[in-house]
């Protein structure tokens, strides 16, 4: 059973686009790394923030959207899965900024996800408008959220660790 599950997650399906197949495992590992990062962020928030429940609930909600993207990618709907996962990541970044405050490290989510979309072999008429909208959302977030007070006050060290993990990850 473990071998079957391993094959399902690591081998591209026949419906997977041929030009995506060489990168299938790398994309799957990227999803896995993101899940590990989410759990690490949630553990840090749980251990250091008194009012942790809403922040973690938001993280898990957008994590589920990204998880559906992972599932779609795994079963062969590569472009739909990647687009959905990127939209979930943008939602997570925006909610993070609103809840714990603006940090220059958090805007990297917008830029990284836009670049990811541009790098994968999705039709240009699909990926370019989405990538540009991600940058537009970032610009709007900067204009309206960079000077706002966070909903939750978190320790500076927690914000710094989250920022550094975002830069590295």
Per-segment meaning from a language model:
Residues 23-31, 158-169:
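Extracellular-loop-to-transmembrane junctions of the mid-late helices
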